[in-house]
Amino acid sequence: MDKYIIMNKNIPLVKTTMSAAGYITEVLQIYNPEAFPVGIFTDDFNKLADKLNQWWRSRIIPASRDGLRYILHLYDVESPAVLSKRSLGLSLSDQYWLKPVGSELTWQEVNFFTNDFSKELGEAFFQKESSRPAINPFTPDASSNGWLKKKWVKINGVTYLAKAGSVPLLQQPYNEIAAANVAEALTIKHVPYELIIEDNRPLCLCPNFITTETEFVPAYFVKDILPKSNNDSVYGHFLRCCDYLQIPDVAGYLQQMLCLDYLIENSDRHYGNFGFIRDANSLKFLGPAPLFDNGTSLWCESLNSEIGTELPAMPFKDTQKKQLALVKECLIDINGIDACAEIVRNTLSTSPYLDKERVTRISEAVGNRARGLKNYLSKLN
């Protein structure tokens, strides 16, 4: 078994053993529990090993990633955890990493924010055919989650995440652009997106919103920070957890998010694709992260005849209409709602993969949602 110290920048957190398959097998020593990732620490070594593995699995390429089987064959590894282990668990979403026991490495020497990184793994996901590449283990692409193909790229000194769509319609990149433009019209804090065409396929680009001084904390690690009371709703419990962690501005952020998700029929707002930003040095929460990862929306997985129907929703209720009922204040620009259908139409119309009927049906469905949203919000104030 290999031995590693999980680090937060240059602060040692815990010494562990890891299997050849890339998973944590045992906790050997705890150093600085106060600097652990949110929601992970317990002084029970066995439970801590389980929690660390849960955390570790959240930062490796998921089994659902398009093209993963080919990548594992190409790199001759049994699991994506091995790829992340080879890159020392480094990420562009936070400052945690694996330091081999006995190593003199520092965070300054290995982090991907200020050092170059390999593009080989990310590019391999997008190549139709490839001979086995020379394996450079240092890449943040080994620590990116989500099922769509993606890669980190640097353009003019700025680090971007590039993400593809799913065949045959490749709609998700266009959805990201449309959702960002809708959020802009509603004055909702969001990550900006732009579209590029690479090898005749659309990709959406968004700049990294995390820096060397911050970390992204997914809502997934916040929601269980307290035990849930039988009297608490899922939404109420989540707010209570955020209050316990002293995260500012949560209620308003969630209400804005629910308005956007209702408008664009976001069917994939799981606890991993929204969350909060924490100061990596003081470990104090700074507030909500800008909204991102809105691509699985606008009925992108529905037939033309199904566009406009209500799809299963998450995370607080099972439909967008029920989630909208959680909104108690109008915290968006209500005058911007009227423009949203046209914003969506103009964006999706640029795709050569979406027929005119589909674009029309989607924009009309957004128009119906816009009228419903405006009517609901106008009654609140």
Residue map of PLM features:
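Extracellular C-type lectin-like domains
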Residues: 264-265, 270
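Phosphate/dinucleotide-binding and metal-coordinating scaffold of catalytic cores
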Residues: 1-259, 263-264, 277-381
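Conserved protein-kinase catalytic-loop segment immediately C-terminal to the catalytic Asp
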Residues: 270, 275-277
